[in-house]
């Protein structure tokens, strides 16, 4: 019988910081996301003065210009088998622009091991990627015969971007997709990030 591993991701492990210094990720071409047709109807009056972050279900997408209606969650628990890939989603939002947002996760460490490399997951086991928005049409009735002019254009969260940092524009949302590839030889137990 396989034993499971559990992971705790505190939001404090995710860093909203000014971009600086070298990074070890390759350079990727950038593109300008299209304007959000829903931006004109967005109400950010309830947003606070500071950037916000919350872990959310991986089953939900967020409109780029819509203030998220979420219960703040500062931690996420994932349960996985050895050799399994599991994911989490963090959503960032701000009423003001924030330059150079980076998302980093500290090394996972087994709850019972504090000093040695034993009981740790390698840094390569965890990836963070910004979710980018692409233009689409509303899903409405699903996949059926339809006339394009009968369906509204929408900006939808779809693409995972490998870039190490990204600016968060004022009154926008930026999801972050977190992937954990559990090594085949990982010891069973509870792993945490500081």
Predicted regions and their residues:
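Positively charged n-region of N-terminal signal peptides that target proteins for export
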Residues: 1-4
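Bacterial N-terminal signal peptides
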Residues: 6-17
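Mature N-terminal, pre-catalytic/accessory segment of carbohydrate-active enzymes
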Residues: 19-194
């Amino acid at each position: 019988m396989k034993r499971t591993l559990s992971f705790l991701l505190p939001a404090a492990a995710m860093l909203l910081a000014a971009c600086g210094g070298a990074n070890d990720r390759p350079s990727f071409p950038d593109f300008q996301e299209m304007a959000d047709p829903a931006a004109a109807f967005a109400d950010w009056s309830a947003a606070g003065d500071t950037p916000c972050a919350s872990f959310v279900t991986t089953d939900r997408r967020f409109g780029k210009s819509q203030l998220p209606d979420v219960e703040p969650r500062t931690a996420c628990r994932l349960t996985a088998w050895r050799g399994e890939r599991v994911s989490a989603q963090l959503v960032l939002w701000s009423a003001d622009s924030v330059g150079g947002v980076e998302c980093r996760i500290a090394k996972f460490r087994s709850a019972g091991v504090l000093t040695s490399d034993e009981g740790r997951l390698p840094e390569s086991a965890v990836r963070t990627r910004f979710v980018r928005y692409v233009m689409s049409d509303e899903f409405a009735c699903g996949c059926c015969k339809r006339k394009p002019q009968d369906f509204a254009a929408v900006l939808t969260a779809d693409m995972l971007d490998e870039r190490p940092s990204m600016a968060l524009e004022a009154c926008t949302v930026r999801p972050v997709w977190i992937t954990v590839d559990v090594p085949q030889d990982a010891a069973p137990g509870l792993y945490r990030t500081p």
